[in-house]
Amino acid sequence: MTAQTPIHVYSEIGKLKKVLLHRPGKEIENLMPDYLERLLFDDIPFLEDAQKEHDAFAQALRDEGVEVLYLETLAAESLVTPEIREAFIDEYLSEANIRGRATKKAIRELLMSIEDNQELIEKTMAGVQKSELPEIPAAEKGLTDLVESSYPFAIDPMPNLYFTRDPFATIGTGVSLNHMFSETRNRETIYGKYIFTHHPIYGGGKVPMVYDRNETTRIEGGDELVLSKDVLAVGISQRTDAASIEKLLVNIFKQNLGFKKVLAFEFANNRKFMHLDTVFTMVDYDKFTIHPEIEGDLRVYSVTYENEALRIVEEKGDLAELLAANLGVEKVELIRCGGDNLVAAGREQWNDGSNTLTIAPGVVVVYNRNTITNAILESKGLKLIKIHGSELVRGRGGPRCMSMPFEREDI
């Protein structure tokens, strides 16, 4: 890595040097049962304990020599001038689906009144309850303002933000600034936009952009895996479609980031398997976790770039042999989440037993609750760093979901 290339990620397993997290904040306390589906949650974490668990996760990474960055801090540091700060507020408001001109004006005044940049960023993440706004004089109300709604928010919270893996993905020296599956999460990508445009270290064109949030087709970082300096893996999933992958790959190949091939994994389209990294992660040079339920229906395509066009071939045969051939190792072992017990596999996959974060070859961060999968991983010689996640897991994401590497050592 040099001063000109502040992002450097050419594997899933190289020693992790720098990582981006988001500490859960007040956005979690703006979850309520009636609107969980709208906000892509199944349950409501207890914020105080979720923060303790997240702080312990961050400390476990620091204890292994990883520098921990925070999304909210980098975003605040990106508002480097009053003009950029105001532009951020206006763009945030334009994407917030605010009903009513007078309401939008009141929220703008609220945000402009917040002097501290980090406090401003955290407020935009938390959302705005209607009860926080002053009463709007009747003469200033438009029709939309006058038609009362029982919905309690003027602006929705962004409770999924602690899953920093998804709004953008680091790939080599570049970044994919994603267009996400849902309106709820697509708003999250504004922070990445300002970081990679205006931040003193990461902005100013220092990081090549291989996908843009203004695209119309969807892709999320949980479906983008860097297997080696030559090979990427992408998932065609509930959250990522094939058209997005084609756009991403053309940009990656055209910008000469060094990658020679992409393996595209097509698997079941449902919330249980929302991303590739919820069912498949790399934990060592020759070892992967996998959820056994996807193996039967999995289809894999090899994609290369020849004569300024994508060349796509459906792969047949054994997945382990395919991975070994592409990674240049003699043999690859697929370690099943939950072992051979379908009940354990289903339970532990739901609790992100397959969603591991590798911080060095064979050194893996996992939730301690997935005892069967963890015992199997340890029996294969892997060193596990076990973290508590009883509250964090309620958002349906594990250690990989909660982290975005900015720098890894090459392998």
From Swiss-Prot:
Pathway: Amino-acid degradation; L-arginine degradation via ADI pathway; carbamoyl phosphate from L-arginine: step 1/2. Signal peptide: none annotated. Gene3D superfamilies: Arginine deiminase, L-arginine/glycine Amidinotransferase, Chain A. GO terms for molecular function: arginine deiminase activity. It catalyses: L-arginine + H2O = L-citrulline + NH4(+). The active site is at C401. It comes from the Bacteria. InterPro entries: Arg_deiminase. PANTHER family: ARGININE DEIMINASE (PTHR47271:SF2). This is Arginine deiminase.
